[in-house]
From Swiss-Prot:
GO terms for biological process: adult locomotory behavior; anterior/posterior pattern specification; DNA-templated transcription; embryonic forelimb morphogenesis; embryonic skeletal system development; embryonic skeletal system morphogenesis; forelimb morphogenesis; hindlimb morphogenesis. Residues 113-134, 220-229 have a biased composition (Gly residues). This is Homeobox protein Hox-D9. One of its GO terms (cellular component) is nucleolus. SMART domains: HOX. It is found in: Nucleus. It comes from Rattus norvegicus.
Length: 343
């Protein structure tokens, strides 16, 4: 081996570190094909000792001219170095105790790192025991940005098989059926109440089935106590049962929103103008009957009698005076209709 090759091996070995090969093998798995690593017995054989002893750092020009090409010609060594910064966290002990559930760890392999979207070479955490992530494995033609978080897998669907995770697909198929609610519930603890995700849909489907099993197809929810069986009337029903009283606010129809008037636009104000006069206050039947009786006795009232009638009927003197005036005009009009001018 030439001096340039020896220097290149020594350069890569110094970058990797002084830990043993067993530590890297246990952490990142066996190296890929063509990876040139540190020899097993570097200082064991006399040939290797003689080879390292022949290194000379005096001729600097020969070192820089010959070592750059040798270092650049080793891409597998650079791939081994990228594994040093792989953010991997060991699976939590709860997953081993309960294999049917899965707790998402806070730090999972990022999609940008090599192996983050991979097929099980120590890239996932969870119920698989560190043998592979339970998330969907991307196909060779699919997106390369890693797993999609927050997407619920199909019921009973196992992750797509790959060359590296064929043996771990059976162990992760049970954990692939999990939902996000179970993961959040286990992360918070088992002390709180459990609310299933699809409880609302299940209750709705049960109510629809109970309504369909009633007297006929036209039976709906909240149509009465004798039609739906055990179906409960809804709060928004127009025909509630007697056992479910609604508030007055819900019974009243919704009021249309009032239009805002623009003080700078008199035309719009005229379109939406309101009358300034007071609203018409009709008399009650009792007041009208008493005024008619008084009108039959006398078409004109004195001031004292008008005051007395107003006090009895709980009216003002002005209201009594106006009513008598209108009643006299009505009587005059009726008399003109009965007696036309031609006769």
């Amino acid at each position: 081996m030439s001096s340039s090759g020896t220097l290149s091996n020594y350069y890569v070995d110094s970058l990797i570190g002084h830990e043993g090969d067993e530590v890297f093998a246990a952490r990142f798995g066996p190296p890929g094909p063509g990876t040139q690593g540190r020899p097993a017995g570097v200082a064991d054989g006399p040939a290797a000792a003689a080879e390292f002893a022949s290194c000379s750092f005096a001729p600097k020009s020969s070192v820089f001219s010959a070592s750059w090409s040798a270092v650049a010609a080793q891409p597998p060594a650079a791939a081994t170095m990228s594994g040093l910064y792989h953010p991997y966290v060991s699976p939590p002990p709860l997953a081993a105790a309960e294999p049917g559930r899965y707790v998402r760890s806070w730090m999972e392999p990022l999609p940008g790192f090599p192996g983050g979207a991979g097929g099980g070479g120590g890239s996932g955490g969870g119920g698989g025991g560190g043998s592979g992530g339970p998330g969907p494995v991307p196909s060779p033609g699919g997106p390369a940005n890693g797993r999609h978080y927050g997407i619920k897998p199909e019921t009973g669907a196992a992750p797509a098989p790959s060359a590296a995770s064929t043996s771990s697909s059976t162990s992760s198929s049970s954990s692939s059926k999990r939902t996000e609610c179970s993961a959040a519930r286990e992360s918070q603890g088992s002390g709180g109440p459990e609310f299933p995700c699809n409880s609302f849909l299940r209750d709705k489907a049960a109510a629809a089935a109970a309504a369909a099993a009633g007297n006929g197809p036209g039976v709906g929810i909240g149509t009465g106590p004798g039609t739906g069986g055990s179906s409960e009337p809804s709060a928004c029903s127009d025909h509630p049962s007697p056992g479910c009283p609604l508030k007055e606010e819900e019974k009243q129809p919704p009021q249309p929103p009032q239009q805002q008037l623009d003080p700078n636009n008199p035309a719009a104000n005229w379109i939406h103008a309101r009358s300034t006069r007071k609203k018409r206050c009709p008399y009650t039947k009792y007041q009208t009957l008493e005024l008619e009786k008084e009108f039959l006795f006398n078409m004109y009232l004195t001031r004292d009698r008008r005051y007395e009638v107003a006090r009895i009927l709980n009216l003002t003197e002005r209201q009594v005076k106006i009513w008598f005036q209108n009643r006299r005009m009505k009587m005059k009009k009726m008399s003109k209709e009965k007696c036309p001018k031609g006769d």
